[in-house]
Amino acid sequence: MCIRDRHRFEKKTLFMIGTFLYVITDLIIYYITGYENFWLLAFIATFGFIGFGMAGVMAWSMIADTIEYGEWKSGFRAEGVLNAAHVFVFKLSVGFSAWLAGVILESTDYVANAIDQSPETLNGLFIMGYIFPAVAGTIAIIVTYFNKYDSNFYERIFSELKQRQS
C-alpha cells in the first residue's frame, strides 16, 4: 500500500486549510466583531482555535518529514540536529514576539494594573492579537503553497532511502 492511499488529504493542504480558518476568523473578529461583545468574539474565535490546532498538528508532522528529506539530500540522518534547530527557532520567535509585544504596549501607552486602558492601547492589543497572527498566517500559507513537498515527493524520497539501505 502506498503512502498516498493511507492519507486522504495532503499534510500541506490541511495545514493551509487550518491556517486559512484562523486567518479568516482573526480578520472577522478584528473588522466585524470587535471586543465589546465577548460571547460573539468567543464563539467566532472557537473556529479560529480549531484551525490553529489543525495547523499546529500538521506543522509538527511536516517537521518530522524534514528528517527524511535531510537524509535523502545529505546522506546523514540528523533527527537531533533538526529537532534542536526547530526548538531554537521556536524559542527565538517567542522571544521576538515578547519583544514586539513590549514595543507595542510601550507605543500605545499601556498602563500596567490599570482598570481602564486608553482606546489606543485597546486597539494596539487587538492588532497584536488578531492582525499580526493573520499576517503571519497569510505568509505561512503562501510559503507552504509554493513548497514542492507533498505525498508524491515524500514517497519518492522514502523509496530512494529504502533502496539505499538495502
What residues fall within each predicted segment?
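Membrane-embedded alpha-helical bundles of multi-pass transporters/translocases
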Residues: 4-166
